[in-house]
Amino acid sequence: MGYFSFFIFLNMIVEQINLSVDNFILGRYVGTTAIAIYSIGMQLNGYFITFANTISSVFITKVNMIVAKNENKDDEINGLFIKVGRIQFIILSYIFLLFLFCGRYFISIWAGEGYNESYYIALMLMIAIFIDLIQNIGIKILEAENKHKMRSIIFVLISCINLLISIPLAKNYGAIGAAVGTAAAFLLGNGLFMNLYYYKVINIDIFVFWKNIFKFIPGLIIMSVIGMFLNNVIDINTSTEFIIFILIFSVLYLIINWNFCINSYEKNLIKVMLNKFKFKLKVVNDLN
């Protein structure tokens, strides 16, 4: 148990180091203004990560039940990995696209003026962590199978790569440079090393996983075009325009994905959530 807990603890420590190393670099080589700008972007990325972790935590019991079985374990793990990954992709893509099109205004009202670079930093960090987040049920599987040691080692290497890349970039390009270095290290670690590890060690059919994820790309492209069109039509300068944009974009995102991307299981999940929402509205109306 001590061995098991140590590497979970090491994972947590290394992840925190990876997320905070840029602030140390910026403080050492650039200055406090760069730290403030970077911190806003990092904080927004932190919310992005927290949201994704909340979703995957729902499936921890299911993971433990599957791992405890011996028969057909690999098939069930693959099915769960793909199922949760698809759900994560749908939700996180929605959040990412909304931030892509509304993020500048949101930062201006949340942090104030003078933090334009924070928008680009947040985008880069979100892109860098995106693969890890849609696959983070894999972390729970590794822990359940007591195979998480290598992930800790991989992330120690990512920390070293992050440090080596980010220092010269931060010196030359400030907070943006530091974000580029971190993004590159995370994409290398999560996009290449961890996918190979999942494939080789816990027998995840990573090719089938990505085949499922790529089915969302046409819808993502359509929504990106729609978002750019809405940005030209709705100039987001007030909270009213901000809310109108979100409402229109959200409805269109649901329609496009419903018709072209999501499967019957995901449609049933949406129906259940909508029914719960309708029930709560009915209760509120009855009380009034």
Predicted regions and their residues:
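Interfacial/gating helices of multi-pass transporter permease domains
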Residues: M1-F4, F24-G46, N116-Y120
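Short runs within selected transmembrane alpha-helices of multi-pass transporters and secretion channels
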Residues: N11, E15-L19, M42-N45, I49, ...
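Membrane-proximal transmembrane or re-entrant/amphipathic helices at the cytosolic face
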Residues: I204-D205, M228-N288
